[in-house]
Amino acid sequence: MPIKSRAVVIPRRNTVELRTVQVLDPRPGDVLVRTAYTSISAGTERMLLDGRMPHPALLFPVVPGYETVGQVVQVGAKAPKELLGQWVYVGGARCFR
């Protein structure tokens, strides 16, 4: 069954929405982390909101925030099973559809 989550989304310039998003299933070497804390940096997110982010992969719609602390709740087929339940720091992620 697909997992849903709530996320802040910037769908277009100068617009912020709270949306329900579908969480991607972990690929074989990936893990799924339930976020407890995430940071929003004033510089990066301001550029995203203003539509001035130079990185080509960051196109609208975008979910801001890329540093997360949370607990591993699911592991992919080739990911170490001992990671389940571990608290981790994530410095970037592939998360939402």
Regions found by a protein language model. Give the residues of each.
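Residue-level signal for short segments within beta-strands and strand-turn junctions
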Residues: 9-11, 50, 72
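Short glycine/threonine/proline-enriched tight-turn/helix- or strand-capping micro-motif at secondary-structure
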Residues: 14-22
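Cytochrome P450 core scaffold surrounding the K-helix E-X-X-R motif
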Residues: 42-50
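Intrinsically disordered, low-complexity, positively charged segments
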Residues: 16, 40-41
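Glycine-rich beta-strand-centered segment in the early N-terminal region that forms part
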Residues: 23-40, 52-96
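Residue-level recognition of beta-strand termini and adjacent short loop/turns
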Residues: 12-14, 27
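Short structural boundary motif marking the start of a folded domain
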Residues: 2-7
